[in-house]
Regions:
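A cross-kingdom feature strongest in bacterial/archaeal respiratory oxidoreductases
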Residues: 48-147, 153-165, 173-242
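An alpha-helix initiation/capping motif
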Residues: 15-19, 152, 173
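Short helix-capping/linker segments at secondary-structure and domain boundaries
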Residues: 13-14, 32-33, 161-169
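A glycine-rich, hydrophobic/aromatic-adjacent loop/helix-cap motif
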Residues: 2-64, 212-216, 224, 229
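Short loop/turn and capping residues at structural boundaries
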Residues: 36-37, 120, 170
């Protein structure tokens, strides 16, 4: 017996409550509880703390409550967020926008003050951590094109220019080992300790009105597959018909 929470549950405003209830239900019924990861490296992102910490703002709030400056990393707001119009308004009104971009997008040219050439995931080495906590390292299939560079190298150079400590990595393996340890693997039980189900975080939700629930087609999930003509001709890329 197993209770699994999927992507729609993770996008729910009360996901923390759903996770807590599923854990309690699993305990009462003797079932296993788990979550189907939203992306290939969702767990890795949590381990690296690439998510709002205590008192931090998530992406939705950063656009709903406009900031003076934004740094976008491998993100195309017009296609990657739930409310692209709101995101573009915030970006166009900002005093400074720096974007690490793989493609020179027309929207980005309008709002970005600086575009840094980011190599796609196919042109860099790195490590993903999957839903069961397994670290999976890989290498780039080709060298980065032109002046584009892997993301970790761009961040390292910026850190060096700003004289920030801790930006002396010489390889993606060194970055991985900084996060996962010298062995480059997760200690047993680290996921359970990292994401304890202890309390729900209340999120105000409007009691009436419309809520958008949308599926992201498999070949529309990132900047690379969106621009692959062969993939866009497949049946899986077609717009759903009600």
């Amino acid at each position: 017996r197993a209770i699994l929470l999927g992507n729609l549950a993770q996008q729910h405003p009360d996901y923390s409550l759903l996770e807590q209830l599923s854990g309690e239900l699993a305990t009462m019924t003797g079932a296993s509880a788990g979550t189907v990861g939203e992306a290939a490296n969702s767990v890795g992102g949590y381990i690296a703390k690439a998510c709002p910490q205590q008192g931090g703002r998530d992406a939705a709030r950063l656009f709903a409550e406009p900031r003076k400056a934004y740094v976008l990393f491998g993100c195309e707001p017009s296609l990657d967020v739930a409310n692209p119009a709101q995101a573009l308004r915030a970006l166009n009104a900002a005093e400074m926008v720096v974007q690490f971009a793989t493609f020179k997008d027309a929207d980005a040219l309008a709002y970005a003050d600086v575009l840094l050439p980011l190599a796609p995931y196919t042109e860099t080495s790195g490590t993903f951590v999957n839903g069961e906590g397994r670290a999976q390292s890989f290498v780039g299939v080709v060298r980065p094109t032109g002046q584009s560079r892997p993301g970790w190298k761009l961040l390292r150079v910026l850190g060096n220019l700003l004289n920030v400590e801790g930006f002396d990595y010489m390889s993606s393996e060194e970055v991985r080992n900084e996060i996962l340890g010298a062995e480059g693997t997760l200690p047993e039980g680290v996921l359970a300790r990292m994401l304890p189900v202890t309390a729900a975080v209340p999120t105000p939700v409007q009691g009436s009105g419309l809520q958008r629930i949308a599926d992201v087609p498999i070949y529309f999930a990132d900047a690379l597959v969106r621009r692959a003509p062969s993939l866009q001709k497949t049946r899986d890329a077609q717009v759903p018909v009600a």
